[in-house]
Each structure stands twice: as structure tokens, then as C-alpha cells.
Amino acid sequence: MLRHSNHIELWSLGTSQKVDNNYTGLVDLQEEPKKLLVLHKTVTDQDDVKEREGISCCCISNNGKWIMYSTNLGSRLFKLERDADNLTLDKIEFEKNKVPCILGTFTSNSSQLITCPNSGGLNVHDLKDGEVVLRQTIEIKEIEDTIMFLQMSPCGKYLLVGDSSSNIVIWTSKNKQWVPYCKLPKYRYPATAMSIHPKTLYLVVSYSDSKIVEYDVKKRQYTPFTEKLSKLDFKSKFYPIKSITFDPRVNSIIIFHDDSSIYVINKEKAFVDKRKKAKITKDTSPQKAVNGIDVPVTKVEVNTLKKYKHLVHFEWLSKDEMVAVEVNPLALFEKLPPAFAQTTFGNK
């Protein structure tokens, strides 16, 4: 599913031809991608001119049967049925559908829809065959600012919520209700991306100053690898990290990207940089410290792939497939409004 400024497109991906395992080039398509449907909401302005309303958020369930998107006028929920070449789309009415949302997500088993209204908090809806029931309304006191992140763990047990003031709160499902679980230590810079590992349940968070941390959700503490992540040295890095994903085949690999590059970290390939040494200090009093022993610094190897200009999305689709979405810079200028004309001293 692709979200544009004023509409949503649902595509079925194409299939590639079979190649040898040692092949390292572009693979020709055996079946082309196919656009299944386009969703949008048309409104009429004061001059009776019809136009499409902007899309603020959208999400699709893992089983592909539920689609939700929101505009400034409210949220819309659809149930999708596909049989061979036939596609059926039914609009489902639900409580709070007139409340616009800034974020939304489905649980891993596609049984619940969780939305974040503009007014704050969370609304949890139970999804049944043809009925949607409001299960729970959550007020999150730990969130101080606009919610920027709303993610569900792959196991479906944990719900991650983060705001623009670096507050990250985790909720857990208990007796069909979401209850507070823990809160990460607040950092002085806002988070730009976060993702939870599907197997280890390690939460990886990146901040606007390029700091990266790894948090063990089960133990509610940072992992020892966080100290090594804090020593990452990105050369010629000018953009914040946009998203984080993991290799489903290897638990030790972390993949994240910014506007122009993809970075791959293998946690098992940390090395000792003997050229750089950290000095251990021993506190003898609250005001005084003496120099200790110089020890080599353990660093993490980062493999960088630079072949993109404006990379907006990157993630794994299946065991051996991943998708990268790149935006053409010329397309950005085409959507900008015309330049503002101003007359100064008789000249325009």
C-alpha cells in the first residue's frame, strides 16, 4: 500500500524469474506489478469545486483484509475481500469514525485497530466479521507532546508509543486490555525512528543526533550492545535515520537508512580499534577523579550502501525480499504551489 498526498494505492507485487543462488544482479520480472485499487475522499469547497482531501495516515492489516485511512474530516475503515481476479471493498462504520487520526495500526493477528486521534490518547477497536466495537480508550499521561510513533510488536504483545519530546512508552496486552508496561529513559534529543526485533524483542531507537540505543523489552533495560552502538562513527552523514529494519534470517543484523544511504550493522562483527583508546577513571571523591588505565575501544563495523538520492522507505517483505521506495526530486517540485508574486517599488 502506497500513501500519496491525497489518495491511497493498493498494489500486488510482481514475481521475478528464477535465478541461481550466486546471482548478484537485477532480476527480470516474470509478472508485472498490478494496481488493485485507489482510495480517496472527495470534498466540495466554498466555491463548489470538488477536490481530494489530504491523507493524514493509513494502515493495512497483516492479513490484507482491513484498510484504514484518515483525513481532516474523520477516519474511514474498509473490509477487503479478494477472490481470484475479483476484488470487493466494503465500507465499515465504527464509533469514533468522525474523529481524525494522526496515526493508526492493526495488531499482529488483525483482530484490533488502534488509532491515535488528534486530541491525544488511543482508541482500541475490536474487529469482527462485519462489526467494529470500541474496546478501550487509553489516556497516556507519560506522553507530553504529539505522538509520532505507534507500532505493534510482531508477537502482538507490546504496543510502542513515542512523541516528539523523546518520550517512549510501552504497553502490553493483558486480559484483552492494554496496560502500561514500561517507559524508556528520556533522551535530550527527539527520536527519528524505532523498530522492535521480531524474535529477540530488542527495541532499537535512533535519535536526531545519530545516537542509537538497543533496549531489551523483556528485561526492561538497555542491552550491553548499546554501549557499542554509542561509538558508531558515521562519516559524511548529514541526514537523520528514517527507519530501522532487521534481517529475518540473521538475528544479529540491523539495517537502517537515511535520505541517501543504507547502513548495515552486524552485531557479531564488532572489532577492537587499537588506535583509539578510552581512559577509565576511578572516582576517589565526589569532586576528584584520577586517571586509570587506557583500554582499546570496541567498535561496530558499519557497511554503507550509497546509491539513492531520496530514499523514503526501506523494509523486508519476506524471507528473501525487501522493498525500497525512492522519490524523484523533480516530482517534489511539481507538487509545490506557484511562487508568490509580490510587487515592490513598481517591479514585480
Spans of model-derived segments:
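Long, low-complexity intrinsically disordered regions enriched in Ser/Thr/Pro/Gly
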Residues: 1-348
